[in-house]
Amino acid sequence: MTIRVGVLGARGKVGQAICAAVRAADDLELVAEVDKGDALETFTETGTEVVVDFTHPDVVMGNLKFLVEHGIHAVVGTTGFDAARLDEVRGWLAASPATGVLIAPNFAIGAVLSMRFAEQAARFFESVEVIELHHPNKADAPSGTAYRTAGLIAEARNRAGVGRSPDATSTELDGARGADVDGVRVHSVRLAGLVAHQEVLFGTQGETLTIRHDSIDRSSFAPGVLLGVREIGKRPGLTVGLDPFLDL
């Protein structure tokens, strides 16, 4: 039995890649392609079961509210989710307990693994910094992936009793040392020619470790998205991150 899939942000670069991947999958049927200016009611009219959202932080909450209220599962790659937004989504889902929502900062399998590797390495090194690099049209900084990575690193270091990275900086230009995410410095680069890239730099006495992931094409997101589409109907409520779907 095929799953009826809709895509929000269908005319965007990622959206186009996801539409192509859904069309190529034997067990999925692309029934709705919706973008800016199109009616969300298209999903109810076409009997869409799962919607993939790659839109913009400014509109994603309205999209999700509509989908949850209509019992449509959602797989969300749009970034900009903080704790308050996630709690709001949980509130909507409480009134629609059979509906599932997956929100992931990154759907590239390698990126998900790199976040897990960084979490595992965090307690063994004195210093750590995160550098994320993206195309110049990205709306948010730091990226959702970098924000999530820094949070996982900070939690792992706190559990292990590891203190903040040493830093004797006493004067700096505003922003020169990057953003502080739970005690982990995060730096954002925006450069034409890039897609999505991240480095986590660890250092301690006598050695360094670099964990790097590169998405060189937006098709790298498709396997993770399709996994989410296939599984979200079995997981009511809110899932944050692709990790549970990969048994990590």
Swiss-Prot record:
PROSITE patterns according to UniProt: DAPB
Catalytic-site annotation from UniProt: H134 (proton donor/acceptor), K138 (proton donor)
UniProt name for this protein: 4-hydroxy-tetrahydrodipicolinate reductase
Keyword field contains Cell membrane: no
Pathway: Amino-acid biosynthesis; L-lysine biosynthesis via DAP pathway; (S)-tetrahydrodipicolinate from L-aspartate: step 4/4
Disulfides per UniProt: none
Catalytic activity: (S)-2,3,4,5-tetrahydrodipicolinate + NAD(+) + H2O = (2S,4S)-4-hydroxy-2,3,4,5-tetrahydrodipicolinate + NADH + H(+); (S)-2,3,4,5-tetrahydrodipicolinate + NADP(+) + H2O = (2S,4S)-4-hydroxy-2,3,4,5-tetrahydrodipicolinate + NADPH + H(+)
EC number: 1.17.1.8
GO process annotations (BP): diaminopimelate biosynthetic process; lysine biosynthetic process via diaminopimelate
Enzyme class: oxidoreductase
The keyword NAD appears for this protein: yes
Molecular function in Gene Ontology: 4-hydroxy-tetrahydrodipicolinate reductase; NAD binding; NADP binding; oxidoreductase activity, acting on CH or CH2 groups, NAD or NADP as acceptor
Function: Catalyzes the conversion of 4-hydroxy-tetrahydrodipicolinate (HTPA) to tetrahydrodipicolinate.
Xref: Pfam families: DapB_C, DapB_N
Keywords of this entry: Amino-acid biosynthesis, Cytoplasm, Diaminopimelate biosynthesis, Lysine biosynthesis, NAD, NADP, Oxidoreductase
Subcellular location: Cytoplasm
Entry superkingdom: Bacteria
Gene Ontology CC entries for this record: cytosol
Binding site for NAD(+): G9, A10, R11, G12, K13, V14, G77, T78, T79, A104, P105, N106, F107
Binding site for (S)-2,3,4,5-tetrahydrodipicolinate: H135, G144, T145
Entry's family note: Belongs to the DapB family.
Species this protein is from: Nocardia farcinica (strain IFM 10152)
